[in-house]
């Protein structure tokens, strides 16, 4: 209209009057906030998690209801800048409260939820959340993989899921190349309880460490970048990596009651845990899959990396060194208030499997042929009949190894127990740039088993 008016010759000038949403860039008054490039990067704008815009634009009405579990070596319980939940747990002894107040866990907790704008210390990503300390070590010494057992880690995740945690942060890894079924079963259980499980990618500078590398598909695996926007040299990478967050020179709380500067993917993961908390603090009814998709779909594509299409990655362009990119708190929370994506429907009603043919109703007809032996090996084949050729289907599973993609997914499994074994199998569907997911809890029931 403005162009038409100007070109008519009747007006000296014509310009549209734009409606602009103003946004404050006011930063919190915490003592060391100016050092927190991860929240506001003055030297390299855009290489941060866009915290200030998120903080100033949204109210987070449910923030005080969100519990974030820190599975670690304990959290110092008398730090002025931390708000701890009134339940903690020692997964090694089974004790409540934990009784361990480790330095590593205290540092992780500060990144997630240190109180913002209180005139002291630092600001956490999700100020106002309750931190649930869960210790998995024998002592509160610096966290080490030799200091616990896989059972302790699995019990820690289950405890968090059973006691109100919505987010479970795991800044630890194991020195093994094989998936750990005991921990994966606990993660699957937590997903079923409505929890997002976040893992650091590891600090070896090579492939993502276990158990993150072999974790169920709803897990978020986080690598680290520095203040220049480059992947940190120690950060784990590869096909299991989902996103990156700041992980070098991060200011946070420590076990002395003071503050310190740290580096590692251990401190990248809690940025994502904090943003997940902010999403649920805006809309606590969102599903695990919706929240995970929001995190991945709203990232910043930081420079120096070539992103491409991966048939197993349905939330946009992806890169093996930085995943979908740098997490973006403002964009993620903005996506909550927008309309939910409209994608192909796929629904399941399957919860338990007996020998024979089973079905999932949704796009066309999904037929599951299940065969297995008690205390032996078997094979599950998932296929879609009468499929829509304009739709991309991707199968994933907690059952190793992953094989195949598209319309048919086959996976081998083995069982050495007389008890039912629970697994997750998921079908992700992409059409017109939109994706949705549906999964089932697959219970492999040994022949002859009686309830």
Annotated model-derived regions:
Residues 1-31, 59, 64, 186:
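Inhibitory N-terminal propeptides of secreted protease zymogens
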Residues 11, 28-175, 220, 228, ...:
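Active-site core segment of subtilase-fold serine proteases
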Residues 109-112, 132-138, 166-170, 233, ...:
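Hydrolase catalytic cores
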Residues 374-385:
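A short beta-strand segment in extracellular, disulfide-stabilized domains
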Residues 387-393:
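Solvent-exposed loop segments of extracellular immunoglobulin-like
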